[in-house]
Design a protein with these regions (language model features):
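Catalytic alpha-helical scaffold of carbohydrate-active enzymes acting on polysaccharides/glycoconjugates
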Residues: 1-131, 138-164
Length: 164
């Protein structure tokens, strides 16, 4: 006898490029929807934003880090989204998606320094990091070693239909 059970689908919503300079109007629309429907997304926060495209947006008129802390208190997961979000290599890394990276192709000491500095900023701002979210979906095995050495054991990437 075969029994078919209905299983509820589970989804993970992921937002990246969260920084002091970004389109906060769009973000607050999503925030309102997520809160209304009790959705707890993962947000990739850039600790030291130097992304020239994001810097074109005006700096938020409120305490950015308090906003991130309030989201974490709501149960949102916070991911380290690189350090500066500045692409310094043309290495696509493990996934081969984009030919640009903040991390992939750099030596261990530079990658480790970026992870350490990013993590330190979060600690100074009284935030706990739940994961790492690579800018441009590009990281390599050296990035993975730097993450593990800094006690970050979860990465998130949103470019597949199935887990890998």
């Amino acid at each position: 006898m075969c029994s078919l059970q209905r299983k509820r689908a589970k989804y993970i919503f992921r937002l990246d490029d969260i920084a002091e300079n970004m389109d906060w109007g769009n973000f607050f629309l999503l925030k309102e929807l997520f809160i209304k429907h009790n959705v707890k997304p993962i947000i990739g926060v850039i600790p030291n934003n130097e992304d020239q495209e994001l810097l074109l947006f005006p700096k938020c008129p409120f305490d950015f880090w308090e906003e991130i802390r309030s989201l974490q208190r709501l149960g949102w997961s916070i991911a380290l989204h690189g350090f500066s979000h500045k692409y310094v290599t043309r290495n696509s890394g493990i996934f081969g998606i984009n030919k640009k990276s903040e991390f992939a192709g750099l030596p261990y000491d530079l990658q480790n320094e970026k992870v350490q500095k990013g993590k330190l900023i979060f600690e100074q701002k009284r935030l706990k990091i739940d994961a790492f979210m690579a800018p441009a979906h590009s990281l390599d095995h050296t990035t993975l070693k730097a993450l593990v050495d800094n006690e970050i054991k979860t990465i998130t990437d949103g470019f597949c239909l199935y887990p890998y």
